[in-house]
Amino acid sequence: MGTRIRSGIFGLAGLTAALLAASAAHAAGEATEAHAVPFVAVAKTAVPDRDWPRKVCELASASCGVPGQPGDADNAPSLYRARNDASGIYYAILPGPQLLKVSFASTAGWKVVQQWNFSDYQPADRVDGDGEPPPLRIYPALYPLGGERFAVAVLAGWSESYSGGGGSWENADFVELRPNGGHARTPRVAKLPFSCDKQIRACFTEHDYQHSPHCSEDFDGSLRLRFVPGASAGHLDWIATWKENHWPGQEPRSKTGHTSVSVTLPAGRDPVAAGNALRDKIPFCEPVN
């Protein structure tokens, strides 16, 4: 599969995943329902220090790439803010992966408020794809566990490529952040489907290309989460909803099918079993016979 097609597939996967935090943060529910805290990327014009990537990466002892440079995308740091945080407070996601809460003042420069390093984290039974797997990454959002406890989504991705198409997938381990800068060894949920995107060629003859309304079979899916009071005080149950679209090959867009599956993930459930509770019910961007 060519570079152009691969880039398009990964771009779409990123877009569908980005919908997750926005949907979770604004999901309708009761007044008592907790919400995810999405991070908002800081625009270049709003960054208080243009040299922040080098300085913040040095503070974290991280080997960072240069934002916007070809080949450095997997190692480039990203800077975010969370809604309602005090002025001068930021979150940085660095290779490793690492999550930093940092502060900036014109007189003092950058300081690390908290640092969570996931370079020692290994997701269980990671899926193999084509070629080298991409590095683990942290999705820019915080997910409530109950009380003042939050988790982050550590994403393990893989891809497939072949003539005329390809696909990319991501599973998420939701791992609790410790107040002292550590992280839980056991995730709240393991291998929960997070996003997927797949394209299969559907045209093979000149007649197909000239007359077909759609020359590929397209799939895309993404996760939404809701958080509700659980049976145990101080703990939240999660409601995971998977939404997937399937546009069949050689059919008009009006024939696109839509799937929505929801499962409840009670607090304290075996992490792998929790992930499988959703995975076993969805196509995950694969054709269903």
Can you say where each PLM-predicted feature lies in the sequence?
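N-terminal secretory signal peptides that target proteins for export/translocation
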Residues: 1-7
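Bacterial N-terminal signal peptides
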Residues: 11-21
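Acidic, small-residue rich beta-repeat scaffolds with periodic aromatic anchors
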Residues: 27-69, 165-171, 177-289
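Basic/polar, acidic-poor N-terminal "presequence/leader" segments
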Residues: 47-102
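Signature of short aromatic-glycine-proline-rich micro-motifs recurring in repeat-based ectodomains
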Residues: 72-79, 128-142, 209-228
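Short N-terminal edge-element motif at the start of the domain
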Residues: 79, 88-148, 160
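Short beta-strand elements that form the blades of beta-propeller/WD-repeat-like
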Residues: 87-94, 149-161, 234-241
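Eukaryote-skewed repeat-based solenoidal scaffolds used as protein-protein interaction platforms
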Residues: 137-148, 153-173, 188-196
